[in-house]
C-alpha cells in the first residue's frame, strides 16, 4: 500500500493548498461475479473501438466482486492463489483510481467556481476603473475650466488699474490689498525683505519703461513670426503654381499626343475604307463582267419550228454559276458589314477609354486646370461635331451616288415597286442637293468622267433599295405590287413628300423652274435635230427605240438573249407600217416581200401590216437583217404636215387620240396636265399597249407576259403618273434630254448577226418586254 499512498500524495500535492483530500478506505467485496455478462463482452472489440461505455457498465461488477470461492468449471479446482492475488490487486488499483477520479472532479468543480468568481470580480473592477476614468476626466475638465477662470480674473485685475492691486516684486503673484502682500513677503520672502523694500521705492516710471520695452520686444517677435509665415505661404503658393504649370504642360502634351493619335486613326480608317471600297468596286466589276460573259454564253439559237431549247443543261449550269456568284457576293457583303461593326465597336471602346481617362484627369486637376480641360473638351466636341458632319456629308454623297445610279439605269416603263422606291430616292436626292450642292456637283463631274462607277455601285444600290422597300412593307423577292399595296403606300409617300416640302419652302418654285428649264432644253434640242429638207422629225417610235437602246447595260438586255426577252424593234416596225407601202387589210395575212411604195390610205399602228414578213429564212444576208431593224425616215401625209411643231411629231394614231381628248389633257398642254415626261410615258404606253392581230401562220417565239402582273402594274403606273410631285421626273429629265439628242443615232446591235428567230411580226403579243423589278 505504499505505492498507492505515494501516488495519492503526489496527486494531492498541487491541490493541498486549495483543499484537503477526504479519507480513503477500501470497501469489502461480497458480491459474486456475473460470468454470463463477462463472457458476453468482446474485449478485442472494446480495445479496437475504444468503447468506454462498455467499460463504465462493467467497472463496478469487476471491481467489487468476490473471487475467493471461484473454482474451475472443468476440473473443479480453486483458482491459483497467485492469479487470485493479481486479480485482487487489480481490483484495489481500480478502486483507488475511482477515488482519485472523484477527487479530481470535485477539485475541477471548485476551481471552476473560483474562476467564475474571479471573472465576476474582474468585470466589477473594470466597471469601477471605467467609472473612475470618467470621474478623472470630469475633474480634469473642471480643473482646466477653473485654471482658465483664474487666468481670466488675473488679466482682469491687471487691466483694471495699477493702484487697485498689489504685485509681489519677488514673484508674479498679485494680491487685493497690501496686508496680504506683506504677509506673503514675510512667509515666502523673509530674507529678501530689504531688497523688496528698495524695489518698492523705485519710481513708477522705470516700471513703465520696462513694460514698454518688453512690449516692443514682443511686438518685434510677432512681426518676425508674421513675416516668416508670409514668406512660407508665398513659397508654398509658388511651388503649387509651378506644380500646376507642370501638370498643365503635361496635360497639353498628352492632349496633343492623343489628338495626333486620333487623327492618325481617322486617317487609317479612311484609308482602310477607301481600300475596301476599291476592292469592292473591282470585285463588283469583275463579277459583273463574269455575269455578262455567262449571259452572253447562255445565248442559244432555236431553229424555226422547234419550241424547246437545245442547250438547257448548259443554261442550267450557267444559272447555277450566276447563283453561286450572287451567294458569294452576299457572303462578302455580310463580311464587310461584320468588319464595319467590329471597327465601330473598337472605336466606341477607345472613345469610352478616352472619356474615362479625361474624367480621371479632370478630377485630379485644380481650378485652372479644370478651365483648361473644359476648353479642351469644347475643342474635342467641336472636332467630334466636325467628324459627324463629315460622316453626314459622306452619307449624303453616297445617297447622291445611289440616286444618280438609279437615274442612269431607270426605265420609262418599269414596275410600280421600282417607281415607289425611286420616288423615295429622288426625295433624298433633292434634300441632299439642297444641303450639299457643291459636293454634289463634284460627284456629278466625277461620275461623268468615269461612268463605270455606276456599274460598281449597282450591288450596293440594289441592297439599299431592297432595304427601303422592306421598310415600306414590300418583301425582297416580290416581282410586283398589287393595286391595294399601291393605294396603301400612296398616303405614306404623300405624307413624306409633304414633310419634305414643308422643310423646303422653295421646293415648288424650284420644281417649276426646273420644269420650264428642261422643257425649253428638250424643245430646243428637238428643233435643232430637225432634218434640213423640211421633213418633220422621226416619230415617237424612234424616241422609244433610242430610249430603249441607250441603256443596254442596266435594266434591259440585248436582242440576242433568249432567256430574258429584250427590247424588240416593234415600234420601229410599226412606224414603217404606218407610213410604208399601201396594203389593204385581208382576213389572213401572208408573207410579202419588202417593197416600199407610196401610201394611199393611212393605216393605224395597231391594225396595220408590217413590211417585214413574219418568217425569214436562215440564209438571209447580214445586210438585210440590219436593214429591217434600222430606222427609215417615213413619208409625211398631207394632213400630218399641217400640224404645228408644238405637237412634237407624234404618230398619226397618237394625234388622233390626243385630238379626241378634252383640252388641257394632251401632250401639248404641259402646264395644266403634268410634265413632259408624263406625256411621253403616256404615249409610249399607248404604243406598247395597242393590241395587234396575229396571223394564222405566225409562231410566238417569246413568253407571254403574265396578265395578272399587267393588271397589277397598270393602276400603279397610273398612280405614278398622276403624282405631280414625283421626283422620278426630276431625276430622269437629264437622261431623257440625252436620249432625245441621240434619237437620230440609234445604237447598233451588240452582235454582228441578228438571229432570224427574233424577226417576228409586229402583231405578236410577245413583243412587249418583261421588265424585271429589283
Swiss-Prot record:
**Would the keyword Amino-acid biosynthesis be found if you checked this record's keyword annotation?**
no
Acidic residues compositional bias: what residue ranges?
421-433
Where is the stretch described as Disordered? 415-435, 515-674, 686-774
The terms under GO molecular function for this entry are: zinc ion binding
Q: Which family does it belong to?
A: Belongs to the DZIP C2H2-type zinc-finger protein family.
Assembly, per entry: Interacts with SEPTIN2.
Modification type Phosphoserine: residues: 425-426
Summarize the protein's role: Involved in primary cilium formation. Probably acts as a transition zone protein required for localization of PKD1/PC1 and PKD2/PC2 to the ciliary membrane.
| Composition bias, Basic and acidic residues | 515-526
Q: Which organism is it from?
A: Mus musculus
User: Which GO annotations describe the biological process of this protein?
Assistant: ciliary transition zone assembly; cilium assembly; floor plate development; neural tube patterning; protein localization to cilium; protein localization to organelle; regulation of protein localization; smoothened signaling pathway
Subcellular location per UniProt equals:
Cytoplasm, Cytoskeleton, Cilium basal body; Cytoplasm, Cytoskeleton, Microtubule organizing center, Centrosome, Centriole
Designated name of the protein: Cilium assembly protein DZIP1L
**What is one cellular component GO term in this UniProt entry?**
ciliary basal body
Provide ranges: composition bias, Low complexity: 597-616
Q: Which UniProt key words apply to this protein? A: Cell projection, Cilium, Coiled coil, Cytoplasm, Cytoskeleton, Metal-binding, Phosphoprotein, Zinc, Zinc-finger
Family matches, as Pfam families:
Dzip-like_N
Coiled coil ranges: 204-450
Q: What are the residue ranges of zinc fingers typed C2H2-type?
A: 166-189
